[in-house]
Amino acid sequence: MQIRRRPPSVAVNVQELQYQVKTPENEPRNILEKIVWFKETEVEQMRDSVSLLDLRKQVANCEPPLSFLDALKHGKTQPALIAEVKKASPSKGVLRENFDPVAIAQAYEAAGASCLSVLTDAEFFQGSFDYLQQIRAAVSLPLLCKEFVIYPYQIYLARSRGADAVLLIAAILSDQDLTYFLKIIKSLGMTALVEVHTLPELERVMDIPGIELIGINNRDLETFTVDLEVTCQLLAQQGTSLQDQDILVVSESGLHTSADLAQVKQAGAGAVLIGESLVKETGNASTHSETEQMQAKISALFS
């Protein structure tokens, strides 16, 4: 399904009230479309607060980004681990009430993660660009800004807050947008993680020059259902071509056990992105430190 952008508003004003008739054309058809439509309004408001010109000035004063891709290629674990700082999701609600993003990030680093992913969407995932900035000041690992990017503004915002890599979701971007955004990301010295869910999406992005890192999301963002076979099936179809193009593949979502990791590693994934199973508190949270808990979880996953 093609994810649409928000159609122009056709509203009727009656005195001080405004009405709009709901039709299939002006209502989002799924969760992903709802998020994208919200982002359009959100970014407009962000621009009113801080201009793109001001953001670019901030970026010019940032330290050079770290190499996200190199960190994955030389990861401490196999497959390499991108550990995600994530408070909530539309499908599962709040994953952790006692949420300290910096403490979680530091525990991930101590437990052997190669890179970190930080949710920055506030409306649907209770994330924050402030979290990204705070984590950048606290850890030395490369950081991925996990965001629904539809405008260049968001890329510059991510870099200004310390991101070394940015997520680009193929389902919500045209080939033209992907190509343009990749050029911006490369010009900033950052890495793009281009995410796909279907074989047509994978084949489409493989034809776009300059892509070095592809994420296969086992979660359908239209329905939020998860199936690990997505990674296996796509790599069975295109794994050899991906290797020939020297593209590293990240398997994302639905990874909870060592058997899950073994399955996607066998399929050809060079890295995994894990959030929910690491962030959720365990029964012994009160007797073990954050780092001890994380080391135990990661050790169990990679055993």
UniProtKB/Swiss-Prot annotation:
Known EC number: 4.1.1.48
Similarity field: Belongs to the TrpC family.
Top-level enzyme category: lyase
NCBIfam families found in the cross-reference section: PRK00278.1-4 (NF001372), PRK00278.2-4 (NF001377)
Protein species of origin: Acaryochloris marina (strain MBIC 11017)
Keywords: Amino-acid biosynthesis, Aromatic amino acid biosynthesis, Decarboxylase, Lyase, Tryptophan biosynthesis
Protein name, UniProt field: Indole-3-glycerol phosphate synthase
GO process terms (BP): L-tryptophan biosynthetic process
Catalytic activity: 1-(2-carboxyphenylamino)-1-deoxy-D-ribulose 5-phosphate + H(+) = (1S,2R)-1-C-(indol-3-yl)glycerol 3-phosphate + CO2 + H2O
Molecular function via GO: indole-3-glycerol-phosphate synthase activity; phosphoribosylanthranilate isomerase activity
InterPro entries (alphabetical): Aldolase_TIM (IPR013785), Indole-3-glycerol_P_synth (IPR045186), Indole-3-glycerol_P_synth_dom (IPR013798), Indole-3-GlycerolPSynthase_CS (IPR001468), RibuloseP-bd_barrel (IPR011060)
Family annotation (HAMAP family): IGPS_B (MF_00134_B)
SUPFAM superfamilies: Ribulose-phoshate binding barrel
Pathway the protein contributes to: Amino-acid biosynthesis; L-tryptophan biosynthesis; L-tryptophan from chorismate: step 4/5
